[in-house]
Amino acid sequence: MGLLDPDPAEHARELLAAAKPHHRRAVELALCDLYGRRAEAIVRLPRGVERALAHRLLHDPRDLPLLLNFIQCGLWLAFSLTLQLTLLPRDGGLSARAVGLFVVHVVVTWAILGQRFILGMHFAAHRTLISPRVPGAALLNALPQLVLANFWGMPAGMYYLHHVVMHHASNNLFSWDLSGTNSYRRDSPLALLHYIANFALHTFLYLPYYAVVKRRFGLAGFALGSTGAYFAAFHALHAYHPAAFWISLGFSSVLGPVALMAGNFGQHQFINPADPADNYGLTVNLVKAPFNMLTFNDGYHIVHHLNSVRIA
């Protein structure tokens, strides 16, 4: 339970009292997600520091877990990249030390922090995390998508255009939504592979095109510029330190799109063919799923499509 949560016992009684009899069990399970032991933030700060950050830095103090999540991810990436740059020779090839650092980096970055960061960034893309009254708030709010996202295989500056502007506006309906699943056989592994390949191969060109068609010219220009900077940074790091490049960015640039598209395919696997645009018929809510504690209750995907700025 966070610093700003209401009294769970009183709130639970109110929700259960208001529930219809056939909804009561679902509400009981949902309360486990609402008041269960959160696990997004592994690194916690002293309670007084957390309270100060929540009230002085954040636009909504309830978003403190998002901030702590980004802090822990940034600290880990800085630590891991420092080890790679200092312990591995620039001109060195494959070595036991390089393999060891690669394994550790992948385990922590993906197995431990992967869901936490990706879903944290996902919700932060819909919300204003840092209060506008804080100097440099616009830059601070952009850091997860411009800097951190690259280490999870998401090119700088593309996530907002893809997810918020395209996916939610077009509501999973292909062909406007390049990540739409309604045109695929969603019980077919081959269809999943085609879905992933289609997105990975076409997204860099389609997203700016989509923004132009929707007359979001500023976003189109930003997407093209950030993509150019993304590939320039790739080239520069690879030229400077190939091993650090492959450990920190190269591997994730392949795994990231696969993981994201496989996740989206699963979230939009069950669709009502009679009304594929209805938010209640294009995705699911997963109640009391263990991963909800790691992902800001991302299992509540119907709720998210109904109100994308709300964390369930």
Language model: regions and residue ranges:
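Small-residue-enriched core segments of transmembrane alpha-helices in multipass membrane transport
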Residues: 250-259
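Hydrophobic alpha-helical segments with strong N-terminal bias
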Residues: 106, 252, 288-289
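Short alpha-helical catalytic segment bearing the HExxH-like zincin motif
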Residues: 111-120, 249, 265, 297, ...
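Non-catalytic, topology-defining segments of multipass membrane proteins
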Residues: 1-246, 312
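A generic hydrophobic-helix recognition signal that picks specific residues
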Residues: 115, 158, 260-261, 290-298
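Transmembrane alpha-helix/helix-exit interface in multi-pass inner-membrane proteins
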Residues: 159-162, 258-270
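Cytosolic/matrix-facing juxtamembrane and C-terminal tails of multi-pass cellular membrane proteins
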Residues: 265-309
